[in-house]
Each structure stands twice: as C-alpha cells, then as structure tokens.
Regions:
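Acyltransferase donor/substrate-recognition loop-hinge adjacent to the catalytic core
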Residues: 149-222
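Conserved beta-hairpin
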Residues: 56-71, 160, 166-169
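Acyl-donor binding region in acyl/amide transferases
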Residues: 81-168
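Flexible loop/turn segments at secondary-structure boundaries
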Residues: 14, 67, 77-80, 129-131, ...
Length: 222
C-alpha cells in the first residue's frame, strides 16, 4: 500500500510524532531516547520560546494506518537574517529503511520550504543552533551522548540516494579526566593568563551569570 503523509495538527498526533522515535529504536542498546514530556514541550509552539523567531511544520508518514516515518520542517528567521540566507531546516527525522517512505517525507518538507520562499534545506538540525544537530555516519556501536543524534546506518545512505550532500564533519572524542590537573598544564595556564590579561570568573548563582549571557552566545555564534 502507498505511503500517506499527514501534517501533525493535534496534541494526539504530536505525541505519535514523539513516540515514533522510541518505537523505531526499541531494543537498540545504543539509542538513548528523549523524555516524552520534554520533547512535547520542545515541539509545542505555545511553550517553546524558540518559536518567537521560528516557524515549523511536522509531518508523519503512514502505511496501512501505521506510522513509518516522521520529519519536521523549520525556519529560523533570525538565523536567516543574521547570515543573509533563505534556509529551511529539517530535523526530528526518523524513518524505516524504505525509499518510498523517505522520498514522501522529504517531498513534503521540501515543498513546504519552497512555499515559504526558501531556496535551501539543511539538517538534521533543531530550531536553534543550541539544539542537537547532525547525522551519525560512524560509531553506530557506541551509546549516543547528550550532544549527538543517534541514527541507524541506513539513514545517511538514504540521504545520499536522494542527492543530499554532506556539509561538514564533526568529530566527537572521549577524554578521560585525571584526578588532578598536571603541573605542566597549570604552569602553561598561568603563563597564558599573564600574557593575555585573562582571568577565570567564578559565579555563585545563575543571576550573576546573566550580564555575560549575550557575550557568551555571541561568541558561540562566531
């Protein structure tokens, strides 16, 4: 039976959207699912402050009445203005290993992006650059971390089949923290601080950090 694409328009459908990721990876020892309620809030246009600068649409793919894929289309207007671009993002994307399903999902989000006046689609991304980004292409036998998105090996293969190309590589490293900072590193740290007039700031509470928040985010964006 053919694939049917439906836009998510109710809370019930949104929960299906969230739970599909959990169902698809059920039994996978390396996948760490998100918390359902937390994901619901993230995708809720009335609760996530990102929607002050973002637009979004969610799609579910059905076959024989069963959910077989999901995808979100997003536009971060502020990011587009900052970088003078017309980019739509795709994210929260999951699907069974089926070309018909994948094509239908991306056809839907590509059509939406064009209708919004966008000329490019990139992802997987979140609403902002502080959200999870990227698609796993190696390390499928490693437990996913809080900074990454875990996916099956067939995901990048399906993306390449459709003609999508890789933008850049991100590498993740495991670092073992010693009991104490090596003396050599302490000496180098002191030299660098004196040379550039640097100082380490210690904050007692969240309120004391706020005056520096904009500078921190500006540095991250740069």
């Amino acid at each position: 039976m053919s694939v049917v694409i439906k836009e998510v328009t109710s809370k019930k459908e949104l929960k299906k959207f969230v739970k599909f990721n959990i169902e698809l990876y059920k039994g996978n020892p390396y996948h760490v699912p998100g918390l359902i309620e937390e994901e619901m809030v993230t995708l809720d246009k009335k609760k996530n402050p990102a929607f002050e600068v973002c637009d979004a649409i969610y799609f579910l793919a059905y076959r024989d009445g069963k959910v077989v894929g999901r995808i979100a289309g997003m536009i971060n207007r502020r990011s587009n203005e900052t970088w003078n671009q017309k980019y739509a993002r795709f994210g929260f994307v999951d699907f069974i290993d089926d070309a018909e399903v994948v094509d239908a999902l991306f056809d839907a989000v590509e059509k939406w992006a064009k209708e919004q006046g966008m000329d490019a689609l990139h992802g997987p991304m979140g609403f902002t650059d502080m959200d999870h980004e990227g698609m796993l292409i190696e390390g499928f036998d490693q437990i996913g971390t809080m900074a990454t998105i875990y996916n099956y090996p067939y995901y990048p293969k399906q993306m390449e089949r459709m003609g999508y190309t890789k933008d850049q590589d991100w590498h993740e490293f495991k670092i073992y923290i010693p009991d104490g900072v090596p003396e050599k590193h302490l000496r180098i740290g002191e030299i660098v601080k004196k040379k550039y007039g640097l100082k380490v700031m210690k904050f007692k509470n969240a309120k004391s950090i706020m005056p520096y928040a904009q500078k921190v985010f500006r540095t991250l964006n740069e």
